Amino acid sequence: MNLPSKIKIGGHQYSVVFPYVFTERFDRCGDHDGSTNTIRIADNEFNVKRADSSITVTLIHEILHAIDQTTGHDMFQGSEGEKHIEALSEGIYQVLIDNPELRKGV
């Protein structure tokens, strides 16, 4: 799977590192670092290759974290915030997949 190496979010240029190996935490699939404007996405989880759909949902998830931080809202903090981000990520992915005409106009 190919992901863009750069994404602009809220006027900020983010680097996307893919594939990234999380040596510090094996249970992590993605990470957003607002201090370095970096999004890291793993292509493996517990030594198993991840599906492209899962990788895309993770990218959306980390983009939502970046939007939340760059807008200064910080609405999605803590475990409850993660649940909301996860639900939004899956929902946005489903809408984009189920409605390809939306992707054409973007």
Q: Model segments located where?
A:
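Active-site recognition of the HExxH zinc-binding catalytic motif
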Residues: 57-69
